Amino acid sequence: INICFLDNRVVGKTHLTISLGIEACKQNIKTRFYTFKELIDLLTVTDSKEIINKTLKQLSRIELLIIDEICYSAITKEQADLFYQLMSLKYEMKSTIITTNITFSSWGESFSNKIVSAAIIDRLVHHSKVFKITGESYRLKDYKTEKSLNIRQS
């Protein structure tokens, strides 16, 4: 099963996924956490097809892969293709948890390829629980509290 956390604000999606990852580790579930940028960098660190395929296989074997901040910045078509390959390898085999700040309908712009983004979304949401997180930004809440207390920075 996959889990997708969606919202365009800072409401604690990352903290929630980290907590789920910690609980998975306590259950002896092999878990890895990456930001989307870190994951894409890992997949594109080399031009060697052999190393890329080895990395894809290693990542696909992880029982719970947590990917934070999908689509916070645009990626190239080649990077999108590699991410698609990873999601295809994991599809119906291992679990993935993602966070994103944009709707699925906007992913095509970030992935530079609407067809690939649709295929990735299809694999992620099939057998998935999708949660739209609502609420006030934790960071803005803290800022408002500090402001109301007249805390001054020196």
What annotation goes with each model-predicted range?
Residues 21-34:
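Post-Walker A helix-loop "phosphate-sensing" segment adjacent to the P-loop in P-loop NTPases
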Residues 64:
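Walker B motif beta-strand of ABC-family P-loop ATPases
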Residues 1-16:
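Walker A/P-loop nucleotide-binding motif
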Residues 17-20, 86:
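Aromatic/hydrophobic pocket-lining residues that form π-stacking "cages" and hydrophobic walls in ligand
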Residues 15, 26, 59-60:
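Short gly/pro-enriched beta-turn/loop segments at secondary-structure junctions
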